[in-house]
Protein backbone atom coordinates (compact mmCIF):
# COMPACT_ATOMS: atom_id res chain seq x y z
CA UNK A 1 0.00 0.00 0.00
CA UNK A 2 1.77 3.17 -1.16
CA UNK A 3 2.32 6.00 1.26
CA UNK A 4 1.18 9.23 -0.37
CA UNK A 5 1.83 11.67 2.48
CA UNK A 6 3.12 11.95 6.04
CA UNK A 7 2.66 14.83 8.49
CA UNK A 8 2.53 15.31 12.28
CA UNK A 9 2.98 11.57 12.82
CA UNK A 10 0.07 10.72 10.52
CA UNK A 11 0.67 8.44 7.53
CA UNK A 12 -1.71 8.57 4.56
CA UNK A 13 -1.89 5.50 2.30
CA UNK A 14 -3.92 4.25 -0.66
CA UNK A 15 -4.49 0.63 -1.67
CA UNK A 16 -4.43 -0.39 -5.31
CA UNK A 17 -7.84 -1.48 -6.67
CA UNK A 18 -9.51 -0.82 -3.30
CA UNK A 19 -13.28 -0.97 -2.83
CA UNK A 20 -15.55 2.09 -3.22
CA UNK A 21 -16.39 4.62 -1.95
CA UNK A 22 -13.19 6.52 -2.74
CA UNK A 23 -11.15 6.63 0.46
CA UNK A 24 -7.67 6.62 1.95
CA UNK A 25 -6.17 5.10 5.06
CA UNK A 26 -4.98 7.47 7.80
CA UNK A 27 -2.65 5.81 10.30
CA UNK A 28 -1.70 7.47 13.56
CA UNK A 29 0.33 5.33 15.95
CA UNK A 30 -1.57 2.10 16.47
CA UNK A 31 -4.83 3.57 15.15
CA UNK A 32 -6.14 3.48 11.59
CA UNK A 33 -9.20 5.03 9.94
CA UNK A 34 -10.62 4.72 6.44
CA UNK A 35 -11.54 8.29 5.43
CA UNK A 36 -13.82 9.08 2.50
CA UNK A 37 -12.14 11.41 0.03
CA UNK A 38 -15.27 13.44 -0.78
CA UNK A 39 -16.76 13.88 2.68
CA UNK A 40 -14.05 13.18 5.27
CA UNK A 41 -16.35 10.63 6.90
CA UNK A 42 -14.63 7.78 8.74
CA UNK A 43 -16.05 4.54 7.30
CA UNK A 44 -14.10 2.17 9.47
CA UNK A 45 -11.61 2.37 12.29
CA UNK A 46 -10.69 5.31 14.48
CA UNK A 47 -7.97 7.90 15.02
CA UNK A 48 -7.92 10.56 17.74
CA UNK A 49 -10.05 13.65 17.10
CA UNK A 50 -7.08 16.04 16.77
CA UNK A 51 -5.40 13.76 14.22
CA UNK A 52 -8.66 13.45 12.27
CA UNK A 53 -9.04 17.24 12.20
CA UNK A 54 -5.53 17.53 10.72
CA UNK A 55 -6.32 14.80 8.19
CA UNK A 56 -9.46 16.64 7.08
CA UNK A 57 -7.62 19.96 6.76
CA UNK A 58 -5.10 18.22 4.52
CA UNK A 59 -7.88 16.40 2.61
CA UNK A 60 -9.67 19.64 1.76
CA UNK A 61 -6.46 21.29 0.50
CA UNK A 62 -5.59 18.30 -1.70
CA UNK A 63 -9.05 17.08 -2.72
CA UNK A 64 -8.38 17.07 -6.47
CA UNK A 65 -5.03 15.32 -6.06
CA UNK A 66 -6.69 12.67 -3.88
CA UNK A 67 -9.37 12.10 -6.53
CA UNK A 68 -6.68 11.68 -9.18
CA UNK A 69 -4.62 9.29 -7.04
CA UNK A 70 -7.74 7.24 -6.26
CA UNK A 71 -8.43 6.91 -9.98
CA UNK A 72 -4.81 5.90 -10.62
CA UNK A 73 -4.91 3.32 -7.83
CA UNK A 74 -8.11 1.77 -9.18
CA UNK A 75 -6.40 1.40 -12.57
CA UNK A 76 -3.17 0.10 -11.01
CA UNK A 77 -1.24 3.11 -12.29
CA UNK A 78 1.54 4.81 -10.27
CA UNK A 79 0.23 6.85 -7.35
CA UNK A 80 1.77 10.28 -6.91
CA UNK A 81 2.89 11.66 -3.53
CA UNK A 82 0.92 14.58 -2.10
CA UNK A 83 2.47 17.49 -0.21
CA UNK A 84 2.11 17.12 3.57
CA UNK A 85 0.24 19.54 5.79
CA UNK A 86 2.51 22.35 7.02
Model-found features: residue ranges?
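Basic nucleic-acid-binding interfaces
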Residues: 1-86
Amino acid sequence: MPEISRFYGIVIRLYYRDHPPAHFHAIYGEHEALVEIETGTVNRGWIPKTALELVNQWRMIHLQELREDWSRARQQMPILPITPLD
